[in-house]
Amino acid sequence: MRRFLLPVIFVIAAVVYSSIVVVTEGTRGIMLRFNKVQRDADNKVVVYEPGLHFKVPLIDSIKVLDARIRTLDGSATRFVTVEKKDLLVDSYVKWKISDFGRFYTSTGGGDYAQAANLLSRKVNDRLRSEIGSRTIKDIVSGTRGELMEGAKKALSSGQDSTAELGIEVIDVRVKQINLPDEVSSSIYQRMRAERDAVAREHRSQGKEKAAFIQADVDRKVTLILANANKTAQELRGSGDAAAAKLYSDAFAQEPQFFTFVRSLKAYEASFANSDNIMILKPDSDFFRFMQAPKK
């Protein structure tokens, strides 16, 4: 009897064990019967909350789906602004499953890769619409917050809504905005040309101002030199006049001494060079101070 009882107990235990399903915290379970989604009386997909549940062995199965917030980190995508300028925008999306039944059916059985692909398309379509209505300046510095908020609202409602996928978008964020290499090079060349033009203009203005300053300095120098020469001429004239007056006064007071001094200077100048030749009579008046005084 015991020989037959043990297998029966083992089978019953196995059946009971295989009938128990544990849905852990942070997940939800969807009941599948013969791989078909089970629905309740209201035709809604049966979703199991975290806890202990039962199923029919070999007939029912549970598909466990993650109920936590997930992050879709997309690659940089090219978008066109209202100015017809290309931008490379790198963004990410925070999302979670809001309708587990719809998510399961719309993603081919809860395929997260397919869900990410579908969500990425919707996000890019929304960003394309938002960026296409703004300028580069608005996107880079002005209304980036409005852009992200607009994308989030559009993905939560309207034709771009992710509700049809059973997904709720929690947040949309733009990580980085860059220009394509060819556009960056073009803008760099244009900025360099503009800076070169400004530099040339500044240099031209500087040269013009330097020439003006130089001309003004030259004019002032010429005026100062002219005034100095005028003053020097006046002083020289005054000095010559004073010297002439002194000579005249001295001559008037001591005419003989004055004549003697002038003769000595004449001798000095005449005999300074040994090569000088003078043809004069010995009794010439030039030598009167070199002759013996008359008795």
From Swiss-Prot:
Cellular compartments annotated: Membrane
Pfam families for this protein: Band_7
The keyword Transmembrane belongs to this UniProt entry's keyword annotation: yes
Entry-linked InterPro entries: Band_7, Band_7/SPFH_dom_sf, HflC
Gene Ontology CC annotations of this record: membrane
SUPFAM superfamilies documented for this protein: Band 7/SPFH domain
Transmembrane residue ranges: 4-24
NCBIfam families: hflC
Oligomeric form and interacting partners: HflC and HflK may interact to form a multimeric complex.
Protein family per UniProt: Belongs to the band 7/mec-2 family. HflC subfamily.
Known role: HflC and HflK could regulate a protease.
Name the UniProt record assigns to this protein: Protein HflC
Provenance organism: Haemophilus influenzae (strain ATCC 51907 / DSM 11121 / KW20 / Rd)
Phylogenetic placement of the source organism: Bacteria, Pseudomonadati, Pseudomonadota, Gammaproteobacteria, Pasteurellales
